[in-house]
Structure formats: C-alpha cells, structure tokens
C-alpha cells in the first residue's frame, strides 16, 4: 500500500515534500490518490503534481481547451537535472520474478527496449523514415507494427514527454506528420474526458446505451 510505504519513509527519513507526475487513471488510482492527499495534508507535506500530458485538472468548461493545449505544448522543455542526490538507507528488497507471483513466463521476443536514448531514436526514425506511411499503415495490424510511431511506451513511462515529441514533430512536414500530430492531440483529448467524467468507467458513456449490457 503506497500510504504505508510513504509513512515508513516519513518516519525513517522525514519528508519535506512529495513530487509526482499528474495522473489520470481509473477509479482505483483516483481513490489511492485521495488517500495519499489526505496523508500528505495530515502531516503538513506539500504534494506537487507535475502535468504529464496536455490535461487540465478541475476544468469548469471545455471551451478553450484546444487553445490551452497548444499553449501548454509550446512551453519550453524543462532541462533534465545534471544529477540526483541519492537517498541512502533504503532497501528495495527482492524484486519478484514471475514464478514467485505464480505467473507464467511472459515470452515476448520482440518487446521494445526501454530507455530515453532508445525512445529518441524511435522518434527520429519515425519522423524521418516512417511518417509518410503513417496515415495508411495505422489501421491494419499487418502494417501498424512498422508504420506507426511506437512511442506509446516511452510516453507512458516518461522517457519522452508529449511536449518534446510534438515540438520535435513540428520541425518536420508532410501529411503523415500532420496526421501524427492530430493523434497526439486526440490522446490528451480523450484523457481529458476521463479526467472530467470519471464516472464513465462505471457507466455507459451515452445514456441511450444504459441497460443494453447485462451485468
């Protein structure tokens, strides 16, 4: 439980502030975040959440969202720190492998390699060589594997930021690049829907569909 982990860290080391990226998840992560927020307030710890994508919290209206998204994406890219001060005395324990968790081996020989340098290489290769095929290739599983950007994992894990991907993309031109940039916009647009309407995880998005699915 994350609150128990944070509390142990607070007692052992002391915590002056809590920093994380701003996440739009599901109902479970939302309840978790509320418990973390309550824990932080109880101990007088400031919790700073850094926006990960072009999603805005607590919007009263969707009017002007696209203009706000463009403004967020146009902001300067924050440079990476030269170094991070390590915290000594933390034992992460043994990271369990699949047999310990009673899971079968996850054999995936063509799994993508993680890391920022590989993510940047994937982005460059897409924009320079594969983007021209993107509008035609994205819809078929036979061609999407090589015709799409393959950046989802790098965006999800924070190896690349949405802002730097879009800004890099706008140094290139062509129909494929424009189509790709539209999908980046849609990515944040649909996450914004979940941010604004978290209940759609548990109910039909369109009210006319209520009752069609049997529980």
Regions found by a protein language model. Give the residues of each.
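Long, charged, mostly alpha-helical binding arms that flank functional sites
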Residues: 215
């Amino acid at each position: 439980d994350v609150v128990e982990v944070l509390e142990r860290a607070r007692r052992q080391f002391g915590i002056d502030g809590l920093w994380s990226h701003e996440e739009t998840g599901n109902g479970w992560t939302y309840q978790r975040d509320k418990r973390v927020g309550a824990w932080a307030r109880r101990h007088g710890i400031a919790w700073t959440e850094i926006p990960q994508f072009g999603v805005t919290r607590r919007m009263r209206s969707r009017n002007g969202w696209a203009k706000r998204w463009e403004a967020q994406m146009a902001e300067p890219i924050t440079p990476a720190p030269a170094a991070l001060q390590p915290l000594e005395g933390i034992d992460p324990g043994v990271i369990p492998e699949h047999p310990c968790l009673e899971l079968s081996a996850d054999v995936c020989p063509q799994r993508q390699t993680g890391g920022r340098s590989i993510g940047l290489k994937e982005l460059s290769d897409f924009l320079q060589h594969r983007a021209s095929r993107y509008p035609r290739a994205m819809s078929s599983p036979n061609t999407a594997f090589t015709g799409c950007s393959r950046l989802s994992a790098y965006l999800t894990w924070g190896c690349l930021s949405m802002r730097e991907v879009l800004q890099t993309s706008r140094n290139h031109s062509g129909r494929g690049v424009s189509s790709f940039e539209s999908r980046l916009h849609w990515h944040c647009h649909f996450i914004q829907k979940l941010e604004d309407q978290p209940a759609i995880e548990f109910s039909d998005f369109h009210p006319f569909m209520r009752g069609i699915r049997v529980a």
